Amino acid sequence: GSFAYSNLSGRLQWGAQAFSQTQFFFTPGYSLYSSFDFLTRDQAVATQTMRGATVFGIYPISRFRRLELSAGFYHSSENFDDPSVQTANEAFLSNEFGVELFRDGLFAPLTATYVQETTIFREFGPLAGNTVRISFTESPKLGNTLSQRSVDADARYYFRLGDTGLLAFRARGFKSWGDYPDFTFFGGNSEMRGYEYLEFIGHKAFFANVELRFPLV
């Protein structure tokens, strides 16, 4: 859940929010030990719980473009749903690589984002225009906080065909680095059709697709 306050009275919009949220994702299906089989999809389910607060500001450059700035402080906890898999994973990574897959600690992220939105919508979804979102996040090392940097870019273009048809283009790139780099995960109907939901995960990722869309009714 979350609690938020927003002030939209001026051109510079600002606000703050406190949150506690848990989401699930699928970890890579690697072998924990040489005697183990690869993780099944059910065994690879993990959860990420984040609790903290952020302050943010939104400044419109024009009708279709804006800048967003935010600063926050939160605690992140990640773990496998299956405790036996969690124990085996920690032992394997510690013995083989001396690293941890999951991040557990405090972060103090500072984020700057550019957003462009000219998309025209109909009752069935986007029809024409484009959407661009580019963000950079810096989580510095402050005392016992964990450090990371991330860049995330998402661009979409909708080319109208007739009254209701369109070609939809999308490209997205993500990269995170530092002592405790962030993950991105994607896959499924909304991003990569034909693949399992959230099938892909990593610190670096890129995908692009083109779709021909037209409503049947």
Task: For the regions a language model picked out, list residue spans one by one.
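Short, solvent-exposed aromatic-acidic interface loops
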Residues: 76-78, 174
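Predominantly transmembrane beta-strands of Gram-negative outer membrane beta-barrel pores used
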Residues: 1-20
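C-terminal outer-membrane beta-barrel translocator/porin domains of Gram-negative envelope proteins
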Residues: 17, 23-24, 29-46, 55-56, ...
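Interface/linker segment at the passenger-translocator junction
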Residues: 1, 62, 80-82
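Conserved NTP-handling cores and scaffolds of large molecular machines
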Residues: 9, 65, 77, 118, ...
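Face-selective signature of the C-terminal outer-membrane beta-barrel domain
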Residues: 49, 58-76, 128-138
